[in-house]
Amino acid sequence: DDPTGAHRILVLEGAFEEGIGFDGITTAEAGHDAFLPLMIAAAQTARMKLGTNVAIAFPRSPMVTAQMAWDLAHFSGGRFTLGLGTQVKGHNERRYSTPWPSAPGPRMREYLLCLKAIFASFQHPGKPTYFEGEFYRFTMMAPFFNPGPILHPQVPLYVSAVGPYMARLSGELCDGLRLHPISTFRHTRDVIVPAVAAGAAKSGRDACGFDLVGAPFLATGRTDADVEQARNSVRKQIAFYASTRSYHGVLAHHGWEDTGLELHALSVAGKWTEMPALITDDMLEEWAVVATYDRLADAVRAKAEGLFRTVTLTLLDEARRDVDLMRDTLRRLHQD
């Protein structure tokens, strides 16, 4: 086994990030499983929250997800947050061998309700709470298979969202919402926030404590020249995401439908190098925080304050060479 592999790196990363002031660390389900690294990180950290950002829901049954989440909640001392996403049809069918029988929203709704029923049954073995829906059912919980109660049974639930349906669903049933980076600041303010509030009102909840997690792109560097180079890199990322038709609702909100169609056509033709030029400076400002390191904290606050409760930031490469730089940025972000 390679001791310098991805999971070994995550162990070191978690302890390092906690030490310089990050409030939490999250894992994406990309090349590796989203859950296993967090068990490792939980053993190496004491304070920071640990979450999936996000785990793909449908390839796993609610019971499989619930068991992993329950163990992580217990082992981490209540620091685990469960973030779930649907992915798109092609990935479910062609990569995960998972059927896509209908629109994902109603299925995610049942998935969350089923999870809640399973968690309640774990915590109260003598009084199981069952669930039966169109897509998911949980109607059996023998004592032998019940992990039993834990000290922190309220596992915070998050879903990823780009459109209003999932945003309403999160407001109704979840503790938070993890925005996709394709969500612009204006689309979030105009579409996502009202949808979350509507979902919270439907369930009689107060949305004030809801954790709306933003994930803006960062175009940053030590000098203005570094920032300009980072802007070009971010344009490539934005162009890639904006070429996906599933995300064109965000572009339509800004009147950028034609840009989305052109980006999609270029991607189909394999003309990837031509795509970033379609992302204008005005577009970039709606998707990204652009600033040198010394102005980054103020720039993030200017874009995020009053909109996001939590902001996901990628650990800056410079931080490994200049820890004080990252620590100071985080300190200023934490200031009231």
Give the location of each predicted region.
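Active-site-adjacent structural elements that line small-molecule/cofactor binding pockets in enzymes
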Residues: D1-D336
